[in-house]
UniProtKB/Swiss-Prot annotation:
UniProt keyword terms in alphabetical order: Amino-acid biosynthesis, Cytoplasm, Isomerase, Lysine biosynthesis
PANTHER family: DIAMINOPIMELATE EPIMERASE (PTHR31689:SF0), DIAMINOPIMELATE EPIMERASE, CHLOROPLASTIC (PTHR31689)
GO biological process: lysine biosynthetic process via diaminopimelate
Similarity comment: family membership: Belongs to the diaminopimelate epimerase family.
Origin species: Rhizobium etli (strain ATCC 51251 / DSM 11541 / JCM 21823 / NBRC 15573 / CFN 42)
GO molecular function, one term: diaminopimelate epimerase activity
The protein's role, per its UniProt record: Catalyzes the stereoinversion of LL-2,6-diaminopimelate (L,L-DAP) to meso-diaminopimelate (meso-DAP), a precursor of L-lysine and an essential component of the bacterial peptidoglycan.
Catalytic site positions: 76, 224
UniProt superkingdom: Bacteria
HAMAP family, sorted: DAP_epimerase (MF_00197)
Full protein name: Diaminopimelate epimerase
GO cellular component: cytosol
UniProt gene name: dapF
Any Pfam family hit: DAP_epimerase
Amino acid sequence: MSATVEFARMNGLGNKILVVDMRGRSDKVTPAAAVALNADPQTEFDQIMAIHDPKADGTDAFIDILNSDGSKAQACGNGTRCVVQALAAETGRKAFTFQTVAGILNAIEHEDGTISVDMGKPVFDWDRIPLAEEFHDTSRIELQIGPIDNPLLHSPSAMSMGNPHAIFWVDKDVMSYDLARFGPLLENHPMFPERANITLAQVTSPTTMTTRTWERGAGLTLACGSAACSAAVSAARTGRTGRKVKINVASAKPPAMLSIEWRERDDHVIMTGPAEWEWSGRLDPATGCWSRDDAREVEAQ
């Protein structure tokens, strides 16, 4: 095993996150290591958030994000909150600025332990989401699943929140749909040349929504922060809600809410929610071999 690094198993609303400290190193967590870690029931995850030394002035770190299949992700809101909690515990600071491949993220930990992340501006242009076909209005695109005359799902809102999202509006409980069956079909639909995150969204009031997500590169997930942001923005964009909503993530464990604001003054999306540390260890970023840090657990207790 090469020199190991510290990592923490965390979650954001049940979204399984591995936060890996790669600071001071020039190598990266490899796709092979990600696949190996996800194959182990003790370390299976939705995203890896690898913290690297900053590359840009005015930032605290560069965050490299991997999905459980080893592919790259551009954004992960729940994972970003986990990184903030980990670094706040380490440094005593509350505010951080991160660079990702999708851009700059600003985040702050509040006194109540919740964390707000400025996810930046949403993208609606069809060729920047991207979509395979030109749509003048991406708030409702032509896509459906099921019989032509009685589709199960149809006419999603499409956008990017650093990564591509399709939001399907439903009237029934989002848990009543077999998302595990048709999620992969929609994720890999030819309409999405870079694949897409697929979310079912039910508007329950002008200020509340319920969502469930099939995550690109990770599959059926307990929660997805960028999907919640995309659902909130798409709901406001189509007149279903206002710009401030509470998102009930239907499959989150434990049950919890995300607060999303699509800020009018600058169009930035602000996501606020919890993060939770579970346990820590060390891993080889090349192979995914790992060990648990029992001493840290005793200290935390």
